C-alpha cells in the first residue's frame, strides 16, 4: 500500500504521498509518484491501494473532472453515481484523495464520496499514523499545510513498513 495525506490551512491545500510499491512483503519500487495535478493544475489527487485499481479509479475521476469543467464536487458525485451502476467496477481496492481550492474529498473504490469535516485526509496503510500526526500539528502549531503534510508523512514512514521516505508533494494556493 502507501500513505497519502492532504492538509488544508491558510488558503493552501497540499497532497503528499510516499513512493513505495509493495507486492506482498516485497518492496518492488521506492520512487513511485502517487500524487498528481489534474485539470489545468487546479486539482490535486493522490491514490492508494491496488495499483491497477488505483489507476482505474484515477482515470475515471480525471475523465469526470474534464467532463464537468473542473468542478470537483460535481465530478466526484457523478462518478459515484456511475460507479454504483457498474457491477465490474463496484469493488475496486483503492482510494483517492482529491482537493481543489474549495473542497477536499475521499473517493473510494466502492463509489463512496466523503468530505472530511476538518479538511484533513489520510489514506493507505500509514493513513492512521499520518492523520494522528497531522491532527496534532494542526491543533498545536502554526506550521503551514505543506510542512504539516511533509512531517506527518515522515512520521508515518517511520512507523509503517509499507510507507517509505520518498515523497511527492503537490501544493495549491488559492
UniProtKB/Swiss-Prot annotation:
It is found in: Cytoplasm. InterPro entries: ATP-dep_Prtase_HsIV_su (IPR022281), Ntn_hydrolases_N (IPR029055), Proteasome_sua/b (IPR001353), Proteasome_suB-type (IPR023333). Belongs to the peptidase T1B family. HslV subfamily. Allosterically activated by HslU binding. Protease subunit of a proteasome-like degradation complex believed to be a general protein degrading machinery. HAMAP family: HslV. One of its GO terms (biological process) is proteolysis involved in protein catabolic process. Its EC number is 3.4.25.2. Keywords: Allosteric enzyme, Cytoplasm, Hydrolase, Metal-binding, Protease, Sodium, Threonine protease. The active site is at 2. The keyword Ribosomal protein does not apply. Its main location: cytoplasm. Gene3D superfamilies: Glutamine Phosphoribosylpyrophosphate, subunit 1, domain 1. The keyword S-adenosyl-L-methionine does not apply. One of its GO terms (molecular function) is threonine-type endopeptidase activity. This is ATP-dependent protease subunit HslV. The gene is hslV. It is an enzyme of class 3 (hydrolase). Na(+) binds at residues 157, 160, 163. It catalyses: ATP-dependent cleavage of peptide bonds with broad specificity. GO terms for cellular component: HslUV protease complex; proteasome core complex. A double ring-shaped homohexamer of HslV is capped on each side by a ring-shaped HslU homohexamer. The assembly of the HslU/HslV complex is dependent on binding of ATP. The lineage of its organism: Bacteria, Pseudomonadati, Pseudomonadota, Gammaproteobacteria, Alteromonadales.
Amino acid at each position: 500500500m502507501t500513505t497519502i495525506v492532504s492538509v488544508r490551512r491558510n488558503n493552501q491545500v497540499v497532497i503528499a504521498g510516499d513512493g513505495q510499491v509493495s507486492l506482498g512483503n516485497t518492496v518492488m519500487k521506492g520512487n513511485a509518484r502517487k500524487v498528481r495535478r489534474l485539470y489545468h493544475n487546479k486539482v490535486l489527487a493522490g491514490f492508494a491501494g491496488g495499483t491497477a485499481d488505483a489507476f482505474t479509479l484515477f482515470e475515471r475521476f480525471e475523465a469526470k473532472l474534464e467532463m464537468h469543467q473542473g468542478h470537483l464536487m460535481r465530478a466526484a458525485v457523478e462518478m459515484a453515481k456511475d460507479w454504483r451502476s457498474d457491477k465490474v467496477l463496484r469493488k475496486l481496492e483503492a482510494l483517492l484523495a482529491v482537493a481543489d481550492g474549495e473542497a477536499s474529498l475521499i473517493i473510494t473504490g466502492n463509489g463512496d464520496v466523503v468530505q472530511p469535516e476538518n479538511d484533513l485526509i489520510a489514506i493507505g496503510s500509514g493513513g492512521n499514523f499520518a492523520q494522528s500526526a497531522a491532527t496534532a500539528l494542526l491543533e498545536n502549531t502554526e506550521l503551514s499545510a505543506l510542512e504539516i503534510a511533509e512531517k506527518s508523512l515522515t512520521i508515518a514512514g517511520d512507523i509503517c513498513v509499507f510507507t517509505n521516505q520518498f515523497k511527492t508533494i503537490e501544493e495549491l494556493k488559492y
